[in-house]
Amino acid sequence: MTIFRCQDNCAERGYLYAGLEFGAECYCGHKIQATNVSEAECDMECKGERGSVCGGANRLSVFRLQLAQESARRYGSAVFRGCFRRPDNLSLALPVTAAMPNMSVDKCVDLCTEKEYPLAALAGTACHCGFPTTRFPLHEREDEQLCAQKCSAEEFESCGTPRYFIVYQTQVQDNRCMDRRFLPAKSKQLIALASFPGAGNTWARHLIELATGFYTGSYYFDGSLYNKGFKGERDHWRSGRTICIKTHESGQKEIEAFDAAILLIRNPYKALMAEFNRKYGGHIGFAAHAHWKGKEWPEFVRNYAPWWATHTLDWLKFGKKVLVVHFEDLKRDLFVQLGRMVSLLGVAVREDRLLCVESQKDGNFKRSGLRKLEYDPYTADMQKVISAYIKMVDAALKGRNLTGVPDDYYPR
């Protein structure tokens, strides 16, 4: 165990604190219910990290974590969504309300779960249940201090106020976007969902299927994806029964076979690592440490990094109608970016359906992130080469009056 690994484990699961004990044991939590002791009592060296302290005998070294906004804080089975202003028409936005003098997070979540609603909103001594809708879309978070009123039944929890609600997502599935089928009539155009491998194509297909209600197809056939619910996987890519076609192809002939395309672009540093993990660990697996340290990784970067650039350049050059979507923008603002994608596909954008997708955006096709490398696998020479490819793609995008690559692509 190392401090980094423990912190990463807890942060990935959405906890506020990480604690280490006995030099090797990692604990996660949302609150600290013990008093401070002298730091000298934490005297055990981390078993996986010489020179660092990982608690002691019945003593925890505790770290407060800086969570990314997307990180999901959890209380039992419920996922913390944030602090939000009371909606204008409360009874329409959140149709079930119950007074709870002895309010706690668990009590409100249990009530809404029992009533089969995916949202539980705590408002002081009132609990409200409902769905994310245009009346209550959960898009404008407020400062959590505005919701910091303590629960009457649990002093370490916040229960919101009559004006500012603390919102949790229950385990109840929002079924408004779960129906999927093949197109009722053969499509008159072939639309590609094009990406470099590792850029999130499988995840994007999941989002598109939920948002449109139609299956996506593939230029290839992957039996494991078919078995996980991608029923369009078995159809020939020209069948016309699917809303769009997954492809990693980048040749002129292959590109010109499509009438339009959604071009999904991802930070090459992240895409290369994701594809390397897939190649050696499956769609939601991870490459072994030996693969990163062996000859496989340098050879992979040497072969795949140029392809990352030429893939985008070819689609921009030969594509008939190309909508560029950056993976990072899709993660950051799914509602807007997915709406753009659905519009290109010729399907009416239903806002309530997009809100439903937001609550189930990960599906079962995202790597958990719990096995991150503790070092940067990119050498200085690799970074120099990849940075040149990033600048090349950025210039090509701007040359077509499109937004360039996101700022976090560089510098590293």
Please describe what each predicted stretch is.
Residues 1-176:
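Peripheral, non-catalytic regulatory segments
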Residues 217-218, 347-357:
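Short, surface-exposed acidic
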Residues 173-325, 370-412:
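PAPS-dependent sulfotransferase catalytic domain
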Residues 212-213, 337-351:
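Non-catalytic, well-ordered alpha-helical segments in soluble enzyme domains
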Residues 24-25, 107, 126, 133, ...:
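Non-catalytic cap/lid and distal C-terminal segments of serine-dependent acyl enzymes
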Residues 318-344:
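Phosphate-binding beta-loop-alpha motif at adenosine-nucleotide cofactor sites
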Residues 99-102, 123, 198, 202, ...:
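Intrinsic disorder
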Residues 5, 107, 202-203, 307, ...:
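Acidic, Ser/Thr-rich intrinsically disordered and amphipathic helical segments
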